[in-house]
């Protein structure tokens, strides 16, 4: 499925700025780009249309030998992160071209993809907001349990998708319709209204809506 173009960046953290009417706006600071184009794929040779972009320079010892050869074709150095974005018209881009925050404009809506903060193994009360059992009146050792998970004889198994305790977080999450409040092109910084997935210094992909 074709997507809109975007660039990679790091979530610096959250702060607030003041609008012209004096109201405080919570924003996320994203250090984005520059992202050089490493490869342009097309339907004739690759079977699909896409653009590969890179982010954050890396030392040679931290890059595998096959990846070094791949980066060498672009002639832009070695990088830590490589991401492929499927596009409808990748022909307008060329290898070596640098993508910066100038792709976007203040007031534009974007979607941000990142990896949510991992919470480890959690019970149903924290993971799914269950109410839990009674605190007293005969309740013993099951105060935070999830209760019944199904019948015995029939169906005789737990239905797929049943909300139970388990690993929470550390998943790929996309937040849509985030407004760009300001762009600091000289610092490669985008200020996005609201929160984006992931911890501080987490890798994110900012794409046009």
UniProtKB/Swiss-Prot annotation:
<keyword id="KW-0687">Ribonucleoprotein</keyword>
<dbReference type="InterPro" id="IPR000597">
    <property type="entry name" value="Ribosomal_uL3"/>
</dbReference>
<dbReference type="GO" id="GO:0006412">
    <property type="term" value="P:translation"/>
</dbReference>
<dbReference type="GO" id="GO:0019843">
    <property type="term" value="F:rRNA binding"/>
</dbReference>
<protein>
    <recommendedName>
        <fullName>Large ribosomal subunit protein uL3</fullName>
    </recommendedName>
</protein>
<dbReference type="GO" id="GO:0003735">
    <property type="term" value="F:structural constituent of ribosome"/>
</dbReference>
<dbReference type="Pfam" id="PF00297">
    <property type="entry name" value="Ribosomal_L3"/>
</dbReference>
<keyword id="KW-0689">Ribosomal protein</keyword>
<dbReference type="InterPro" id="IPR019927">
    <property type="entry name" value="Ribosomal_uL3_bac/org-type"/>
</dbReference>
<comment type="subunit">
    <text>Part of the 50S ribosomal subunit. Forms a cluster with proteins L14 and L19.</text>
</comment>
<keyword id="KW-0699">rRNA-binding</keyword>
<comment type="similarity">
    <text>Belongs to the universal ribosomal protein uL3 family.</text>
</comment>
<dbReference type="InterPro" id="IPR009000">
    <property type="entry name" value="Transl_B-barrel_sf"/>
</dbReference>
<comment type="function">
    <text>One of the primary rRNA binding proteins, it binds directly near the 3'-end of the 23S rRNA, where it nucleates assembly of the 50S subunit.</text>
</comment>
<keyword id="KW-0694">RNA-binding</keyword>
<dbReference type="GO" id="GO:0022625">
    <property type="term" value="C:cytosolic large ribosomal subunit"/>
</dbReference>
